């Protein structure tokens, strides 16, 4: 995975994918995915607008032997994607760094170690977090093909969209930034 996180010109690391209406895959219908990595070798991202109601962050840290504290109460657990759904990934602001942290850009990072969970529980964690179970992954050229097939739109990501916009509003906010009303979109498009 480290090779995927190197900077590559012409790729969409640090952007958001926005699912086109009628994309045909219920796992991704209506989703916004923050791309943590996108290179010729593949892509990896975290769905940022699908909360999991059946599990809480205090439950997760408790199961891992970390004492839940009031700092855990505001962290929501999200479906990060269909790959490795039993594994946790924390997308967060870059104010927190440790040995296992992978910087995506100057403002956001990804950590998938117990250290970040301990830091969150102790109040020493990142300012903003998304705790995700699983991730969205694409093999070499797969995402590029989906982009050419009009499965996804792309929008530059920022802290407001990723962390501060309400989960239920992220899709319409991302579409709105593109000047698009999703109700008026068709999944069919022509190419010249």
From Swiss-Prot:
PANTHER family: UNCHARACTERIZED PROTEIN YQGE (PTHR30327), UPF0301 PROTEIN YQGE (PTHR30327:SF1). It comes from the Bacteria. It holds the Pfam family DUF179. This is UPF0301 protein Rru_A3059. It comes from Rhodospirillum rubrum (strain ATCC 11170 / ATH 1.1.1 / DSM 467 / LMG 4362 / NCIMB 8255 / S1). Belongs to the UPF0301 (AlgH) family. GO terms for cellular component: cytosol.
